[in-house]
Amino acid sequence: MAKEKKRGFFSWLGFGQKEQTPEKETEVQNEQPVVEEIVQAQEPVKASEQAVEEQPQAHTEAEAETFAADVVEVTEQVAESEKAQPEAEVVAQPEPVVEETPEPVAIEREELPLPEDVNAEAVSPEEWQAEAETVEIVEAAEEEAAKEEITDEELETALAAEAAEEAVMVVPPAEEEQPVEEIAQEQEKPTKEGFFARLKRSLLKTKENLGSGFISLFRGKKIDDDLFEELEEQLLIADVGVETTRKIITNLTEGASRKQLRDAEALYGLLKEEMGEILAKVDEPLNVEGKAPFVILMVGVNGVGKTTTIGKLARQFEQQGKSVMLAAGDTFRAAAVEQLQVWGQRNNIPVIAQHTGADSASVIFDAIQAAKARNIDVLIADTAGRLQNKSHLMEELKKIVRVMKKLDVEAPHEVMLTIDASTGQNAVSQAKLFHEAVGLTGITLTKLDGTAKGGVIFSVADQFGIPIRYIGVGERIEDLRPFKADDFIEALFARED
């Protein structure tokens, strides 16, 4: 009855609850921001607390129904209930204990519970599950943070690796430039020994069949017919040619009997002299003095290196202090005009050219007129590559020569045939037919460094007697050198001890 008197009449009728309800609603509204910040794992705890708050309300309704009949006694105690109403309100307010709920929430949000505290406190299963889920979420967040840190480290490692690779990629060019500079310094030295060493390296493949390759053939043998047969076979393998080989063998046989040679190694020296005499007949450098302009007409088959040889010759003449002009007479091959123009741009040399497909004779005619007007020292005219067995193309070449003679009776002052040394005995056929068509006055032998068929130079020199002006032993401009028979023979027969 004491509890019933304390609650009062208005509380049984629900007046006290109406006054408490706004207060609870305001408190709940104030707690909503706090509750929204709580982790999802704490929702079961909130549900249990709400259930505890709803129990007093249900109990109050049951008691109200039980004492509804005793209205008379309640009316007599109105005065007492009015006095007790403030106390009831005071007592009813702390029952939900709403203010105490944020304290553990705030503690859990600011500081995570330690495992020792969890074990020491008696926690309900729902709270234990909520805390376990909270710990799992925190651990997952820490793992993600750790992964992010590892990712940053991996990124730094990757950046360092890329920087190292870039450093590695930058280093080799610097290492490669040093040998190039050293080679350039060696080339600048006009000493005979420097070029001789380079010539020996370029003739390594040819020396396998000629020159020093004969040492093993002659060593420890007697001079007899078997030795000459082996020598003849070796000369034919080196593309010296049948006629030139027979001539060499005949002269060696006569010389050996005349000098009464018995040692095969002595025959090796005699062979060197014999082959040196063949090349000495064609050792005649090109002289461009006395003519203005000195016109050089370049002829040859396709792909032997005419245009490249023109660019190298132009550079060498310019280094000698002569003014040079180029004529792009190869109007048939695609990009031939552009190729010659590139050589002109590299060396600051003027190039006379027309569109592709134009008449080659007209281009060269215009070039001769321009060279005379500008007082050019040397004019080098390019022509389209043509096979020696194409009669109509050879007739076109004759037409070019006739057109040139209209401006200068002595032009062209040099008709230079470019021969690829790797073609072997086909070079003999080229020299024969081009010589019959336009009358060759010089020969340039290219690509000697990449073939074992360099013996063709002896066949061409022996059969035609046309001066060999230049030999190409490499790709650089300096690798196109004036031909010197003595240097060539010495490099060919140099012994590798």
UniProtKB/Swiss-Prot annotation:
Gene3D superfamilies, A to Z: P-loop containing nucleotide triphosphate hydrolases, Signal recognition particle SRP54, nucleotide-binding domain
Topology with respect to the bilayer: Peripheral membrane protein
GO CC, one annotated term: plasma membrane
MF terms (GO), sorted A to Z: ATP hydrolysis activity; GTP binding; GTPase activity; protein homodimerization activity; signal recognition particle binding
Intracellular or extracellular location(s): Cell inner membrane; Cytoplasm
Domain notes from UniProt: Contains an acidic N-terminal A domain, a central N domain and a C-terminal GTPase G domain that can bind and hydrolyze GTP. Contains at least two lipid-binding sites. The first site contains the first 14 amino acids (helix 1) and the second binding site is an amphipathic alpha-helix located at the interface between the A- and the N-domain (helix 2).
Family of the protein in this entry: Belongs to the GTP-binding SRP family. FtsY subfamily.
Protein name: Signal recognition particle receptor FtsY
UniProt organism field: Escherichia coli (strain K12)
